[in-house]
């Protein structure tokens, strides 16, 4: 199974880059080597990543595996579907007040 591994190390100059490319090319099963960012080496293929890390540590003291994943990783959806927020229906805060008979009431008042 093809997988993609990203290696990262501290000091990355032209000479170190050439040595790293040479070491990685010697591994059987390596299909793609990509050096776009400074200090990061992206290798795709079917190989033992731990042995490759050990060989790269001979070139540079600090080498770390940053990411490991399958070759054809699906692109992440940058605009996720937003769920509509449910409407909040508010009830009455207090029970309704009953009107008491007063001066202007229609009820009969006995005097």
UniProtKB/Swiss-Prot annotation:
<keyword id="KW-0479">Metal-binding</keyword>
<keyword id="KW-0636">Prenylation</keyword>
<feature type="lipid moiety-binding region" description="S-farnesyl cysteine">
    <location>
        <position position="108"/>
    </location>
</feature>
<feature type="modified residue" description="Cysteine methyl ester">
    <location>
        <position position="108"/>
    </location>
</feature>
<dbReference type="InterPro" id="IPR006121">
    <property type="entry name" value="HMA_dom"/>
</dbReference>
<protein>
    <recommendedName>
        <fullName>Heavy metal-associated isoprenylated plant protein 10</fullName>
    </recommendedName>
</protein>
<feature type="propeptide" description="Removed in mature form">
    <location>
        <begin position="109"/>
        <end position="111"/>
    </location>
</feature>
<comment type="function">
    <text>Probable heavy-metal-binding protein.</text>
</comment>
<comment type="similarity">
    <text>Belongs to the HIPP family.</text>
</comment>
<feature type="domain" description="HMA">
    <location>
        <begin position="1"/>
        <end position="68"/>
    </location>
</feature>
<feature type="region of interest" description="Disordered">
    <location>
        <begin position="68"/>
        <end position="111"/>
    </location>
</feature>
<dbReference type="InterPro" id="IPR051863">
    <property type="entry name" value="HIPP"/>
</dbReference>
<keyword id="KW-0449">Lipoprotein</keyword>
<keyword id="KW-0488">Methylation</keyword>
<dbReference type="GO" id="GO:0046872">
    <property type="term" value="F:metal ion binding"/>
</dbReference>
């Amino acid at each position: 199974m093809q997988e993609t591994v990203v290696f990262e190390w501290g000091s990355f100059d032209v000479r170190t880059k050439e040595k790293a490319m040479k070491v990685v090319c010697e591994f059987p099963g390596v299909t793609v080597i990509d050096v776009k960012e400074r200090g990061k080496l992206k290798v795709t293929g079917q190989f033992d990543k731990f042995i490759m890390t050990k060989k790269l540590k001979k070139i540079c003291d600090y080498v770390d595996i940053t990411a490991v994943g399958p070759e054809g990783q699906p692109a992440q959806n940058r605009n996720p579907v937003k769920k509509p927020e449910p409407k909040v229906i508010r009830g009455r805060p207090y029970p309704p007040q009953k009107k008491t008979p007063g001066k202007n009431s229609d009820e009969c008042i006995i005097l």
